[in-house]
Amino acid sequence: MNKIIQLGIIILSVMLVSCSASRTAERYTQQWRYEIEPVSIGTKGSYLIKVWSYSRNQAVAAEQAKKNAVHGVVFRGFTGMNGVSAKPPLATSPNLENEKKEFFDPFFANGGRYMKYVSITNDGSIGAKDRLRVGKEYKIGLIVSVAVDELRKDLEDAGMIRPLGAGFAPR
């Protein structure tokens, strides 16, 4: 009987710790602390970018990099470097995320629809130069591919962004 109680306490402790880690990851995501830099030209319809994410836990930072990459393409864009031209954000309204919160909260939730548009290109391994200690946190750099054409089409279909040709009247 005593062993059953001990086992129950251990299982409960593990569950509480895993829930806490998930809440921590969500809190870091809501702050949207990341940097994006272009790496090279991806295949047609995609961006190949390096995303720098911040977290106290390296595994959390690596997982959040995918979410941050899609968020950056939609809301921030990136400056040009390494022979890659600058890309503006897909969203033209700076307040779109707050205006359409009911759409974007589930979109960026853990395991949300953002996963459809992003993939890590280097099997998820983090190089020594891409793992930096900044105070009590890690700054983790991962190279990801974002399927921009698919993302744009789905956001247009959902009415979140205007189609590319929407500003021009037909003749």
Regions found by a protein language model. Name each.
Residues M1-G8:
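Bacterial N-terminal signal peptides that target proteins for export
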Residues G8-M15:
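Bacterial N-terminal signal peptides
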Residues C19-R171:
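Domain-level marker for long, solvent-exposed, non-transmembrane regions
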